[in-house]
Amino acid sequence: MRDSLGMVVPVWYAPDMPAERMRELLTHTLGDCELFLRPEHIVLVVDGCPQAEAPARHAAAEFAARAGSEPLVVVQPGNEGQGGAVCRGFEHLLRESRVRYLCARDADGDHDIYDLPQLFRLLVQMEEIEGHDRVAVLGQRGDLHRPMGFARGQYEALLNEITLRAVGWAMAQRGQCPDLRYCRRLPGPPDFQSGYKLYTRATAEAFVSALRTAESAQPDQQVLRWGIQFVSTVELLLAGTVFGSVYRLTYDEQPQTSFEHADNRLLAYGRQFVWLYRRLTVPMDLGLRWWDEAILAVHWATVPGGWQELLHIRDYLARECWPQTAAPPPPRRHLMF
């Protein structure tokens, strides 16, 4: 594991975060990494966050004091978003090293280093059993709500469900389906929005290609800022990647979030569903049927304003994806069951 694994840490912190807190989070993130990775296989990508450069270099120097050498610190002058930072780090490792496996871990310490051996073990087993390297493993959270809050947990569950339905429909047209055999030991849809994933070189290259292609196709959409998990997962599934899942630890409450437009869920989540439906050329009757069925099941519909918000996003989907077609009436909640 130590000789064959590379790791990227995208580094961005809010402008008002004290430098001491940044150093603390980075020190925690890098803690004990030398047990599982060689220093030269660790890349910190400071993503257009000048106030984080000194803390990143300080954490790298602390790491070298105990491990013998520093991880690489790459400073990007402009902010490309988490997707851009991870792509930059993966591209470096793919170009400059011979590591067989790659992962990314958040800079807030949420992705516990001691979960990494479990992800690695499953990935290697899958590679051996399947006889190819088109495999990836995700670290599944036991609860989506406690680390992120109720709203984000509900919308991530929606993303996971509709992603599987849409991708399954698209793949079925060519006689295929998503291969989730290694995910089904855990309950529910796989936690595709989890940022703690492990890739082979082949699937890491596909990850980078998916995000770079999506960004270049629609530069005005800034896919690298919001699509790191969603867009890459869709493209990997479509390409026939075999996913596996293992449970991982997570914070009870995240110390920071870089989630864009978290206070505007129509934009934060609506554009992801729009991208999915456009990418797969989903017809309106199917796309809205999936949406209607999914929102009837989520508990977000029961909070004040939640149902209206879900219908607002439904209208947004219809306008953006099928502007020339009148949408059918939305479902009704007030039925006995």
Q: Model regions: which residues?
A:
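Conserved donor nucleotide-binding strand/loop of the catalytic core
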Residues: 61-84, 92
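Short beta-strand-to-loop acidic/aromatic patch adjacent to the donor-nucleotide binding site
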Residues: 98-110
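Terminal low-complexity segments of carbohydrate-biosynthetic enzymes
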Residues: 3, 262-337
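Short beta-strand/loop segment that forms part of the nucleotide-sugar
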Residues: 38-50, 74-78
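Active-site donor/metal-binding and catalytic loop motifs
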Residues: 240-264
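Short, well-formed alpha-helical segments that are part of the catalytic scaffolds
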Residues: 13-35
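A conserved acidic beta->alpha catalytic loop
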Residues: 45-59, 109
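Acceptor/aglycone-binding surface of glycosyltransferases and processive sugar-polymer synthases
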Residues: 84-88, 92, 113-206
